[in-house]
């Protein structure tokens, strides 16, 4: 197969929206991270729920992870 016959790969996400995605995803991730820390500090060991802790931390880590991914793409580190 020749190089000219191949179609050029285009990203499913427009690079012009990388800054906006970065800010939004990191802001949402920081909100859930702050919620997790406030929940840990204000609850006693009797009122804590491990499933709620896991859910909040999972959502926070997903948003922060994708936010960091788009931050890397925004600054030109293509992973």
Curated annotation (Swiss-Prot):
Pathway: Protein modification; protein glycosylation. It is a multi-pass membrane protein. One of its GO terms (biological process) is response to endoplasmic reticulum stress. The chain crosses the membrane at residues 17-37, 55-75. Subunit of the oligosaccharyl transferase (OST) complex that catalyzes the initial transfer of a defined glycan (Glc(3)Man(9)GlcNAc(2) in eukaryotes) from the lipid carrier dolichol-pyrophosphate to an asparagine residue within an Asn-X-Ser/Thr consensus motif in nascent polypeptide chains, the first step in protein N-glycosylation. N-glycosylation occurs cotranslationally and the complex associates with the Sec61 complex at the channel-forming translocon complex that mediates protein translocation across the endoplasmic reticulum (ER). All subunits are required for a maximal enzyme activity. Its main location: membrane. It is found in: Membrane; Endoplasmic reticulum; Cytoplasm. The keyword Transmembrane helix applies. The lineage of its organism: Eukaryota, Metazoa, Chordata, Craniata, Vertebrata. Belongs to the OST5 family. This is Dolichyl-diphosphooligosaccharide--protein glycosyltransferase subunit TMEM258. The keyword Membrane applies. GO terms for cellular component: cytoplasm; endoplasmic reticulum membrane; membrane; oligosaccharyltransferase complex. It comes from Xenopus laevis.
